[in-house]
Amino acid sequence: MTLVLVIDDEPQILRALRINLTVRGYQVITASTGAGALRAAAEHPPDVVILDLGLPDMSGIDVLGGLRGWLTAPVIVLSARTDSSDKVQALDAGADDYVTKPFGMDEFLARLRAAVRRNTAAAELEQPVIETDSFTVDLAGKKVIKDGAEVHLTPTEWGMLEMLARNRGKLVGRGELLKEVWGPAYATETHYLRVYLAQLRRKLEDDPSHPKHLLTESGMGYRFEA
C-alpha cells in the first residue's frame, strides 16, 4: 500500500485529502507543522509527500530541503502561492510537482498517481540485477549468469549489453550506442553493432535466430526486453 505523508496547517485540507486518499487505497499520515512532518517522515518513510509551503513553524522549502537530504520519494507542493518565483524555488529545491490552491481533487489525484508511477518506474530501472527467463544481468557486479554459470563477455560485449540493459524497454539508437561503447569517432560504424549483437545473442539467447531479449529495431537501433 502506498504511504502518503500530507503536510498542511489547514485542517479542512488535511481532512479532505485524508478521506479522498484513504477511499482510493492509500495509507495516509498527516502533519500540520514542519517539525512534525520531518519527525513523521523519519518514523514512517513515505512513498510520496504532499507539502504546503506556508507552515506555522518553518518554511515549506526548509522542510523540503530536510527531506531531500535522505528521501527520494516524490514531493508534490500544494500551495496558495501562485508567483512564478515560488514555483521555481520549490522545484529547484527538489519538488516534483507544484499545485496551486484552490485545486480540483480529480486533477490533483491524477498528478499524484503520475508521480507515483514515475518514481516506481525509476526505481525499477535502477535495480542492479535484471532477470530474464534465459539469463540474469548483474549490473553492479558486471557479470551475466546463464544456466547457473557466469558467461564470459569481452569488455566491448559487456559495454553494449550494459547500455541496452540500463535502458531496457527503450529504443537505443545506433549512433548513441556506438558513441557510448566505442567512442565518438565510431558513430557511423554500424557494422560493429551487428557483429557484437550477434555474438551476444549466441552467448545469451536460448534461440539466437529468434531472440526474445536482444532485439533489433530495423533502421533505428536496438532494444533490451527482460
From Swiss-Prot:
Listed PROSITE patterns: OMPR_PHOB, RESPONSE_REGULATORY
GO CC terms: cytosol; protein-DNA complex
CDD domains: REC_OmpR_KdpE-like (cd17620), trans_reg_C (cd00383)
Keyword flag DNA-binding: yes
Compartment(s): Cytoplasm
Keyword Transport assigned: no
Signal peptide segment: none
DNA-binding region extent: 127-226
Pfam family for this entry, one: Trans_reg_C
Chain ranges of the Response regulatory domain: 3-116
One GO process term, biological-process aspect: regulation of DNA-templated transcription
Posttranslational mods: Phosphorylated by KdpD.
Modification 4-aspartylphosphate occurs at: D52
Disruption phenotype: Cells lacking KdpD and KdpE show an increase in virulence in mouse model of infection, with significantly shorter survival times.
InterPro entries the record matches: CheY-like_superfamily (IPR011006), OmpR/PhoB-type_DNA-bd (IPR001867), Sig_transdc_resp-reg_receiver (IPR001789), WalR-like (IPR039420), WH-like_DNA-bd_sf (IPR036388)
UniProt keywords, alphabetically: Cytoplasm, DNA-binding, Phosphoprotein, Transcription, Transcription regulation, Two-component regulatory system
Entry's Gene Ontology molecular function annotations: phosphorelay response regulator activity; transcription cis-regulatory region binding
Additional free-text comment from the UniProt record: Was identified as a high-confidence drug target.
Described function: Member of the two-component regulatory system KdpD/KdpE involved in the regulation of the kdp operon. Upon phosphorylation by KdpD, functions as a transcription regulator by direct binding to promoter regions of target genes to positively regulate their expression.
Protein name, as recorded: Transcriptional regulatory protein KdpE
Gene: kdpE
